[in-house]
């Protein structure tokens, strides 16, 4: 897992053909807006989160975000523990996101 600044996350993501954006916020938070093309799995699902993560392709690079960066850091750690090698946490989260947004 790597913690990336907003700028680093955006730059690395834009140059990564193997990237998947993962939003780990609640459905209510997602409904208020999200990063385009993000896959949503709520980290508060507990074991359900792990079950859904295990269905993902572990060979991809995962750019993970939440509201402020705390839950996404936890999500990256969980993903690493079940075999995902390339996870990138967005420090500051969606609350500081300056890139494209979708409602």
Task: Give, region by region, the residue ranges found by the protein language model.
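Short, surface-exposed ligand- or partner-binding patches at beta-edge/loop junctions that are enriched
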Residues: 65
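Rhodanese-like catalytic fold shared by cysteine-dependent sulfurtransferases
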Residues: 1-20, 27-61, 70-103
């Amino acid at each position: 897992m790597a913690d990336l600044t907003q700028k680093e996350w955006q730059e690395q993501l834009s140059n990564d053909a193997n990237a998947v954006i993962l939003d780990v916020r609640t459905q209510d938070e997602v409904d208020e807006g999200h990063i385009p093309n993000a896959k949503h799995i709520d980290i508060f699902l507990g074991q359900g989160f792990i079950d859904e993560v295990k269905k993902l392709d572990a060979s991809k690079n995962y750019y993970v975000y939440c509201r402020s960066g705390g839950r996404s850091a936890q999500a990256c750690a969980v993903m690493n523990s079940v075999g995902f090698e390339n996870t990138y946490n967005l420090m500051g989260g969606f609350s500081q996101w300056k890139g494209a947004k979708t409602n």
